[in-house]
Amino acid sequence: MAGHSQFSNIKHRKGAQDAKRSQKFTKLIREITVAAKQGLTDPELNPRLRSAIFSARKENLPKDKIETAIKNAAGNVAGESYEEIQYEGCGPSGAALIVHALTNNRNRTASEIRYIFSRKGGNLGETGCVSYLFDHVGLIVYKAEGINFEDLFNYGIELEVLNVEENNKEELYVITCGVKDFGRVRDAFYTKFGEPELARLSWQPKDLIEVSDKELIDKLSILVEELEDNDDVQYVEGNFIFADKL
């Protein structure tokens, strides 16, 4: 029976992994569809779509699914209409969280997000309740490999960005710029350095809260994970960092 039990556990994990992969694909397709509907269907002329396709390819989303999503958006094929909504709240330890969602039913999504917050030791607040703790900026991220930081930094100065910094731990270069300058800066960096790992408008914390208590780290991690596991949630941003010693 031990062998049977082990096989069952493997099957269960495989099933969970497949479900996560399917959910990830659904979110990627949703982002591609929304990006294509909001702008041109040529990725070279629609940076948001180009970025969505780049992310989809990194996750090995089949090419035919990418093409179908774009064609459906271009042809206005009857289907669900999605809107972008931002939710704000606090988690354990007082950490501020901003939840970004694409939904076809705002009442359902708000109810589900509120339930996750309350069940995991947090509180969903009103719009603006925590966003004042962040700066709204354009965010562009490159992998450090193959790119000279000095070249990137000097180009950032030329484009008058807000900041260019190295994240040595993650081996990334992080560029921030004003929201109004985002399109210009993103396209300029793309032309000179190629497709970034990430390019989007982002809420960057003015100050970071360091969470060092093991129990709070676990609770906050679970809250963020459950939020990101929600079908309508694209990603979550926060103003906290976990202590390195843990």
Swiss-Prot record:
This is Probable transcriptional regulatory protein WP1214. Keywords: Cytoplasm, DNA-binding, Transcription, Transcription regulation. InterPro entries: Integrase-like_N (IPR017856), TACO1_YebC-like_2nd/3rd_dom (IPR048300), TACO1_YebC_N (IPR049083), Transcrip_reg_TACO1-like (IPR002876), Transcrip_reg_TACO1-like_dom3 (IPR026564), YebC-like (IPR029072). One of its GO terms (biological process) is regulation of DNA-templated transcription. It is found in: Cytoplasm. Belongs to the TACO1 family. It comes from Wolbachia pipientis subsp. Culex pipiens (strain wPip). GO terms for molecular function: DNA binding. Residues 1-22 are annotated as: Disordered. One of its GO terms (cellular component) is cytoplasm. Pfam families: TACO1_YebC_N, Transcrip_reg.
